[in-house]
């Protein structure tokens, strides 16, 4: 008997090196059906069928407020690009997509007055529930850098801020192989981190 129904492409488990990364936990939170939907979107945007996408392709992803845009897409690629090729494969993309979903949910949950923006206190809470436990003083400095007048951050600004924090985390963890929270960095490593964040 023939079946004419839609067949989902099987999703293979990610490679072991991917499973050792801090953002693998985002991948593990994705439901099976969501994973197939993400796979379909990924394949539709991967025009050259290379199995990876660039910031130019990723910028078209719509998240709550509209497309990511090239600047945010570039930052997010830097976070999730394990092999530093300037592109992400499907597993990296799926973790990135879930990262954005979690940030968006936490943004909405902390925008208690529904103004469409969040202040430093709300950002601190949203970051904590998103897995970034930073001291409030650091969050306040980041907030004032992103919003010099202190009006609050829209989701697009919050996502860019989180991407910058995640880049710093990824770069730091490259030097903290034992995951102790301590790394030996020289001044050139610091310059690298500053230039990429």
Curated annotation (Swiss-Prot):
It comes from the Eukaryota. GO terms for molecular function: calcium ion binding; calcium-dependent protein binding; identical protein binding. Ca(2+) 2 binds at residues 81, 83, 85, 87, 92. Disruption phenotype: Cells lacking pefA and mutants lacking both pefA and pefB grow normally in axenic medium or on bacterial lawns, and have no major differentiation defect. The keyword Transport does not apply. Gene3D superfamilies: EF-hand. It is a peripheral membrane protein. Ca(2+) 1 binds at residues 46, 48, 50, 52, 57. Ca(2+) 3 binds at residues 111, 113, 115, 117, 122. InterPro entries: EF-hand-dom_pair, EF_Hand_1_Ca_BS, EF_hand_dom, Peflin/Sorcin_CaBP. One of its GO terms (biological process) is response to bacterium. Keywords: Calcium, Cytoplasm, Membrane, Metal-binding, Repeat. Residues 33-67, 68-103, 111-133 form the EF-hand domain. It is found in: Cytoplasm; Membrane. GO terms for cellular component: cytoplasm; membrane; phagocytic vesicle. Belongs to the Peflin/Sorcin family. Homodimer; in presence of Ca(2+). May form heterodimers with pefB. This is Penta-EF hand domain-containing protein 1.
């Amino acid at each position: 008997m023939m079946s004419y129904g839609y067949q989902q492409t099987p999703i293979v488990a990610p490679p072991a090196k991917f499973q050792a990364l801090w953002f693998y936990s985002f991948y593990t939170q994705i439901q099976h059906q969501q994973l197939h939907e993400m796979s379909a979107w990924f394949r539709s945007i991967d025009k050259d069928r290379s199995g990876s996408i660039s910031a130019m392709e990723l910028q078209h992803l719509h998240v709550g407020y509209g497309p990511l845009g090239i600047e945010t897409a570039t930052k997010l690629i830097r976070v999730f690009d394990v092999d530093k090729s300037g592109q992400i494969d499907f597993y990296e993309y799926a973790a990135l997509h879930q990262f954005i979903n979690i940030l968006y949910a936490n943004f909405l949950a902390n925008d208690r007055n529904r103004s469409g923006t969040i202040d430093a206190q709300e950002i601190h809470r949203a970051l904590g529930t998103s897995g970034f436990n930073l001291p409030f003083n650091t969050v306040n400095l980041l907030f004032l850098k992103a919003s010099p007048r202190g009006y609050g951050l829209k989701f697009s600004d919050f996502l860019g801020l989180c991407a910058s924090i995640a880049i710093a985390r990824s770069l730091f963890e490259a030097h903290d192989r034992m995951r102790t929270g301590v790394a030996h960095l020289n001044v050139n490593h610091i310059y690298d981190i500053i230039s990429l964040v």
